């Protein structure tokens, strides 16, 4: 009996040590991503400025191949800017203290839609929502959460007009369960966990642009608010993302 207890304690100590090492490793990776992303911004800004200058001064004055090469370089700088800014945003969310206040989720959704107005106009997307509640949240992070989920719903479409609907209902624990439903390309159930991982992509860059960080950022935001995020979907049949947030301590049931 004594030997069994000793072995169990050794195993528990080993697991605890490994968990601490993993946590430290994750923190170091996040710090590296933040530093690398920050330090890469200035040289990329310089490259982008000079390529734009070339485009303005020499477009149409050289041969067709030159115009094509300059256009490719411009496109490359745009994609590089996204590759740099997304990890930086993730690391900032991971490091920032979450300031919880009574927040109108309807207002934060509207802020997100303003940020997405270009994509909404280009795709002719229809974005509707039910009356949404006041919750305990960091307003900027909740805006980012809605922006990522609605932005993905607009982006991951093959044919037709994106249709997105946002709703909320109280769950059994008295928390608000939000749903973001779309009519997009859907997700195979075997990839449900994978889509929330860092740099995880289910499609090639040629099919859909992106860094594979968007849903990982959503997961980080929700978890830092003490909630959970999940997805229901079938390939080709649209997706519904669910996330939970605490109700407002002030007892405001619905946004005005």
Residue ranges and their predicted role:
Residues 11-18, 22-25, 29:
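PAS/GAF-family sensory domains
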Residues 153-154:
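Short helix-loop "hinge" at the ATP-lid/N-box region of the Bergerat-fold HATPase_c
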Residues 75-80:
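Short alpha-helical segment of the dimerization/phosphotransfer core of two-component systems
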Residues 226-232:
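Glycine-rich ATP-binding loops of the HATPase_c
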Residues 1-4, 181:
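PAS-family sensory domains
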Residues 187-199, 241:
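Short conserved segment of the HATPase_c
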Residues 214, 218:
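Short alpha-helical Gxxx[C/S/T] motif in the catalytic ATP-binding
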């Amino acid at each position: 009996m004594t030997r069994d207890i000793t072995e169990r304690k050794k195993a528990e100590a080993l697991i605890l040590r490994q968990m601490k090492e993993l946590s430290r490793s994750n923190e170091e990776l996040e710090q590296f991503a933040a530093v690398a992303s920050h330090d890469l911004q200035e040289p990329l800004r310089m490259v982008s400025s000079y390529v734009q200058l070339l485009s303005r001064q020499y477009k149409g004055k050289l041969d067709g191949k030159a115009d094509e090469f300059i256009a490719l370089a411009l496109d490359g700088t745009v994609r590089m800017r996204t590759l740099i800014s997304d990890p930086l945003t993730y690391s900032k969310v991971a490091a920032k203290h979450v300031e919880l206040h009574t927040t109108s989720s309807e207002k934060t959704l509207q802020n997100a839609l303003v940020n997405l107005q270009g994509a909404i106009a280009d795709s002719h997307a229809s974005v509707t929502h039910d009356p949404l509640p006041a919750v305990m949240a960091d307003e900027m992070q909740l805006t980012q959460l809605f922006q990522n989920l609605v932005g993905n719903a607009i982006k991951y479409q093959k044919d037709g007009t994106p249709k997105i609907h946002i709703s909320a209902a109280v769950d059994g624990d008295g928390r608000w369960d939000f749903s973001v439903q779309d009519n997009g390309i859907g997700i195979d159930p075997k990839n449900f966990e994978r889509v929330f991982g860092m740099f995880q992509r289910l499609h090639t860059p040629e099919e859909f642009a992106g860094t594979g960080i968007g849903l990982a950022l959503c997961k980080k935001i929700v978890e830092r608010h003490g909630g959970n995020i999940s997805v229901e979907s079938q390939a080709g049949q649209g997706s519904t993302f669910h996330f939970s947030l605490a109700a407002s301590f002030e007892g405001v049931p619905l946004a005005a």
